[in-house]
A protein has these predicted regions:
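Conserved SAM/AdoMet-binding glycine-rich loop
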Residues: 1-38
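Glycine-rich, histidine-containing beta strand-loop boundary motifs that form or position
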Residues: 10, 34-36, 77, 105, ...
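Radical SAM enzyme [4Fe-4S]-AdoMet core and its adjacent flexible, acidic
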Residues: 39-55, 62, 66-169
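C-terminal accessory region of radical SAM enzymes
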Residues: 123-156, 186-233
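Radical SAM enzyme core and accessory elements
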Residues: 179, 218-275
Length: 275
């Protein structure tokens, strides 16, 4: 018997009491998209009339989390060149009542104004260092916060397969378009060379599935000698493909950010252990 778990990601705009109740009853996890401070969120997440959505969605999210009890959720933001001080956004979300927080770097072509580049790395590193101190202060004062990217199991960790191939695209999950087309994940939608089949036609290309199963830390040359390979597990296949043209070629900017996050995650855990 297969066990299916469902997760939903929402931008919060159309949440009603009925939808909140349905999500909380049926979804194993829920991801709430919000970028942090009002001015940060509303710069990138605008409604059709050009106005921001912060005021509308934050109240919906608070209601959902309050009703959800101890079931899994997290608020998920994206930081860009516009908010390289993203530790402030993490703290803003925590102070707004959300104790499960994730922020991810935007992945965009360097020609785009808000894209993150190598020149931004020093500031990004400093923000992660700052978050280590901020989270420690919260815990020292009796508070609780889980910052998604500082969660690491130093005793056992994931199973061997997950250590070798952290990205489950094409094997553990797929993306299905409204037309029934099947892709390894949502970021591959539109890249026809990676269309795995179609539900309506009853087709499925197992060769693509096998290709993604073979994308692991030993198939990626830059991963083989990296100290973080068994925690990063090869990174995002979509980023590797979009920026390097090959799912077996790790995207170096992502690698550098990931290594810094792992360093901070280890430091944060060591601090907790020494208390």
């Amino acid at each position: 018997h297969k066990n299916f778990r469902f997760t939903i990601t929402t931008n919060g705009m159309l949440l009603t009491d009925d939808k909140i109740d349905y999500i909380n009853e049926e979804m194993s996890n829920v991801v709430l998209s919000i970028d942090g401070r009002k001015e940060v969120n509303d710069r990138m997440r605008v409604k059709v009339d050009g106005s921001g959505c912060y005021d509308r969605i934050v109240d919906n999210y608070k209601k959902l989390v309050e009703k959800r009890g101890d079931k899994e959720y997290y608020v998920r933001g994206t930081y860009t060149k516009y908010n390289l001080d993203f530790s402030e956004d993490v703290m803003h979300l925590y102070n707004a009542g959300f104790d499960q927080v994730s922020v991810e770097p935007v992945m965009e072509d360097e020609s785009v104004e808000y894209a993150i580049t190598e020149k931004d790395l020093d500031q990004i590193y400093a923000e992660y260092d700052k978050l280590v101190d901020q989270i420690a202060e919260i815990k020292d004062n009796g508070g609780s916060i889980n910052f998604f990217h500082f969660m690491i199991d130093l005793d056992q960790g994931p199973c061997v397969i997950k250590r070798l191939r952290g990205c489950g695209s094409g094997n553990e999950y797929v993306a299905i378009t409204p037309d029934g087309d099947i892709y390894p994940c949502h970021q591959f939608v539109g890249h026809e060379e990676y269309c795995m089949g179609n539900l309506e036609q009853g087709t499925f290309n197992t060769d693509i599935k096998k290709e993604f199963a073979g994308a692991h830390v030993y198939s990626k040359p830059t991963c083989r000698d990296c100290w973080a390979k068994f925690y990063c597990s090869g990174g995002c296949n979509a980023n590797n493909y979009i920026y390097n043209g090959d799912i077996h070629d790790a995207y170096e900017l992502s690698c550098k950010i990931m290594r810094k996050r792992l360093e901070c995650a280890i430091l944060s855990q060591v601090r907790d252990m020494l208390k």
